[in-house]
Amino acid sequence: RADEMLEIMKLLWSGEMVEFKGQFFNFKKLEMLPAPKKDIPIYVGGFSEPALNRAARHDGWISDMHSLSELEALITKLKEKRQGLPHKENYEYICFSCWDAFSLEGFGQMKNLGVTTMTTYPWMLYGTMNDAPLEQKIEGMEKFYNEIICKLK
């Protein structure tokens, strides 16, 4: 179903009259306006074979939280699946922090694997939990910026 949904979205974004007859979805001629002025990137999440195949055909992949070795295996598999497909400029590997790599070295390893965007809770690296006051979270973000981000640029 997801593959058909993505195909339908791209058809509708064309701004032209389109119709569709698939295994799961069917519709007669219609158009969706206003059409996007430029392509909308499609990032696909998941780590099952169908999800990785789908991600390989689109603009990027969004991981779950994995160990560093699991992430490396998944990115390797995804890169293999992308071989032979039309290459998209600026393919995105969007990662939730690896649970075993909360350090400058760990974030550096994720960057070296090709991770282009990282999602994390930087204050948690310093022992501040989600229910902590905002000031403590901001302090954790500043520390993360100075100790991790600045050193990885």
How would you name each of these model-derived features?
Residues 1-153:
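Active-site-adjacent structural elements that line small-molecule/cofactor binding pockets in enzymes
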